[in-house]
UniProtKB/Swiss-Prot annotation:
Pathway participation: Secondary metabolite biosynthesis; terpenoid biosynthesis
Purpose of the protein: Terpene cyclase; part of the gene cluster that mediates the biosynthesis of pyripyropene A, a specific human acyl-coenzyme A:cholesterol acyltransferase 2 inhibitor. The first step of the pathway is the synthesis of nicotinyl-CoA from nicotinic acid by the nicotinic acid-CoA ligase pyr1. Nicotinyl-CoA is then a substrate of polyketide synthase pyr2 to produce 4-hydroxy-6-(3-pyridinyl)-2H-pyran-2-one (HPPO) which is further prenylated by the polyprenyl transferase pyr6 to yield farnesyl-HPPO.
Protein name (record): Terpene cyclase pyr4
Family: Belongs to the paxB family.
GO cellular component: membrane
One annotated GO biological process: terpenoid biosynthetic process
Membrane listed as a keyword: yes
Species name: Aspergillus fumigatus (strain ATCC MYA-4609 / CBS 101355 / FGSC A1100 / Af293)
Residues annotated as transmembrane: 20-40, 49-69, 79-99, 113-133, 141-161, 168-188, 206-226
Family annotation (Pfam families): Pyr4-TMTC (PF25129)
Amino acid sequence: MDGWSDLSSAPPQYREVAGIADWALLAQGLGWSINYLAMIYHSYKDRTYGMAILPLCCNFAWEFVYSVIYPSHNSAERAVLTTWMILNLFVMYTAIKFAPNEWQHAPLVRQCLPWIFPVAIAAFTAGHLALAATVGVSKAANWGAFLCFELLTSGAVCQLMSRGSSRGASYTIWLSRFLGSYIGGIFLHVRETHWPQEFGWISHPFVTWHGLMCFSLDIAYVTFLWRIRRQEHRSQRKKAL
């Protein structure tokens, strides 16, 4: 993301291809918007929530910080982040509404749900602000997004495995998240190769590790979802007999 960098200092070779990065960003925005809408739909359909609670709170906090407190100077980026934050409000609403259905087996968690959401959002908001104060807004926006995605992908796998059910999950949710996330590699590549003074850190080993970990978790997610769906279909056929 370049909306918090000093674009006036961008080299000519980056300005020539900045449009490619912006189009990739808009495509990423569309993918994640579809993901949010699909989660909202399946939350009402299955009376559950689609995104694990703590990753959801971290993700919403990040969108709030970089939409409201530190808005991007890039109009495309600002539009994408604002859209995500608005859609995520509805994702958050469905999580608050239906979370008690998933915690019947854990009375303490169920009783604390009204506190877990606001406390977690406040804590993650403070964390994102602290990161921005430590490394600068531009780097914090990117590193914070990496943290959100690591929590989200690992949380999605854990949630699917612990439920043992496809409630709140679908191939649409997975595919829109997968494509919406990894198309981001296009604008990361454009920025790293054409503006290395500002985005040379993209080639660091940690970023490579992050990408491989999240990719592996996304593949694990769709594999588990396929197995669970197959088991559910078999059970339905047996009941029909």
